[in-house]
């Protein structure tokens, strides 16, 4: 009898273990919005507002505006005017987070309130460079010309580090890593990256990081639950659509017999 009880207890732990290993999608939400900011999902575009929740593969972009996005529990991404990003990955597995952002155009400021857990990775990629970190403050610029001049339109293509360390690679050769320390920069195009000391006019722009702060933990948990609820609803809708498609197929097969 004791052996039977032990078997039941052990087998009861198996589903829990699998549940812990199942990847979940991190929260990404708008902290502040000023002016024209939008997001695109499934081919549809809508204005971004404070507390707008974003999902993996969403494209977030600004025109004459700015937006601050919290990604996961400790990262804030500030998009300058005329900036476009894709949230390519927002995954958490076994308490390790994997965040990937694609900067299609414009300038993005990234700040971490604390280091990510060991084994985690935050990578932001422009058309020419990839910057990977676990906890720091830095700017990545695609260096493209903005539709209209603004306070950050003079930031050239490159990576500019305020605090911490950033590993930078050419987009076409991600195995070639150049490490940047605080106060350093890499500029140029893909095949001619130049490492140096950050220019004075760029150092002044680093003051923006003082304004970037994550939401309080209690608020984060509330919004995280809301995102999980929305994900569950989306899955139900998708499953319902699949069932309807299956019914239609079966109906056609039956009618053709």
Where do the PLM segments sit?
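C-terminal interaction modules
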Residues: 2-7, 19-25, 44-49, 63, ...
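Hydrophobic h-region of N-terminal signal peptides that target proteins for export
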Residues: 10-17
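A structural signal for short, hydrophobic beta-strand segments that form beta-sheets
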Residues: 23-32, 87
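Elongated, acidic membrane-bridging lipid-handling scaffolds
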Residues: 135-137
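Short, small-residue-rich packing micro-motifs
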Residues: 35, 60-131, 159-168
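N-terminal targeting signals for Sec/Tat export/insertion, comprising classic cleavable signal peptides
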Residues: 29-58, 68
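Short, solvent-exposed loop/turn positions at domain surfaces
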Residues: 48, 54-56, 73, 118, ...
């Amino acid at each position: 009898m004791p052996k039977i009880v032990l078997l039941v207890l052990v087998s009861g732990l198996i589903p829990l273990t699998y549940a812990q290993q199942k990847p979940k999608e991190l929260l990404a939400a708008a902290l502040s919005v000023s002016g024209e900011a939008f997001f695109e999902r499934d081919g549809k575009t809508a204005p971004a507002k404070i507390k707008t929740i974003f999902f993996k593969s969403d494209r977030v972009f600004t025109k004459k505006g700015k937006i601050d996005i919290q990604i996961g529990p400790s990262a804030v991404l500030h998009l300058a005017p005329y900036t476009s990003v894709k949230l390519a990955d927002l995954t958490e597995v076994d308490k390790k987070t994997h965040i990937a952002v694609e900067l299609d155009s414009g300038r993005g400021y990234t700040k971490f309130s604390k280091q990510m857990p060991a084994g985690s990775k935050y990578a932001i990629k422009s058309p020419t460079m990839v910057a990977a970190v676990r906890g720091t403050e830095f700017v990545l610029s695609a260096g493209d010309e903005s539709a209209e001049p603004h306070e950050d339109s003079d930031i050239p293509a490159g990576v500019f580090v305020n605090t911490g360390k950033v590993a930078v690679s050419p987009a076409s050769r991600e195995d070639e890593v150049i490490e940047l320390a605080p106060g350093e920069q890499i500029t140029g195009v893909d095949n001619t990256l130049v490492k140096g000391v950050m220019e004075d006019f760029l150092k002044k722009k680093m003051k923006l990081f003082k304004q970037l702060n994550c939401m309080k933990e209690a608020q984060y948990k509330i919004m995280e639950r809301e995102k999980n609820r929305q994900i569950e609803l989306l899955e139900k809708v998708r499953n319902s659509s699949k069932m309807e498609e299956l019914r239609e197929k079966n109906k056609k097969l039956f009618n053709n017999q």
